[in-house]
């Protein structure tokens, strides 16, 4: 039973880490990366469709993204969606290709992005701590129902705490790595 609670907590904590990784990939660094456009959707035949399903997205010359839409009539909609996003990118179209030059990040923009990254990391830490709290309350419930002893409960809580410490350390590692990436000019 204790192992079930611990493995459930571990899988939930790993999902929190995966969510943090996804959030970190969306934060713009100085380099172009197709995942920058993952959050952009376009109205296509009455459904919101992700931009990465509407065409080929590739990196050109390190600081430029190119989009080659499958349906050329969507070019104006794609441009509008990019302009309305909070990425601060200005698309330029040449024929059937949309180019997105990424402007270099200013020092102020870098600091703002570091704040965003820190907030995402804090959200992940809070999520992990909430999972720890849930697991500990499950252990207390088992103790209350006399399914485990107090020693087993304490041992289970120690295991959950060790798992929590390990996951929070991973969050710190991801945060440190992203901050260094952002502050590198």
From Swiss-Prot:
Please provide the Gene Ontology terms (biological process) for this protein.
cytoplasmic translational termination
Keywords carried by this UniProt record: Cytoplasm, Protein biosynthesis
Q: Per the annotation, which location comes first and is thus the protein's main one?
A: cytoplasm
Question: Mind listing the GO molecular function terms for this protein?
Answer: ribosomal large subunit binding
Instruction: Tell me which CDD domains the record gives.
Output: RRF
Q: Which PANTHER family match?
A: MITOCHONDRIAL RIBOSOME RECYCLING FACTOR PSEUDO 1, RIBOSOME RECYCLING FACTOR
Descriptive protein name: Ribosome-recycling factor
What is the originating organism of this protein?
Alcanivorax borkumensis (strain ATCC 700651 / DSM 11573 / NCIMB 13689 / SK2)
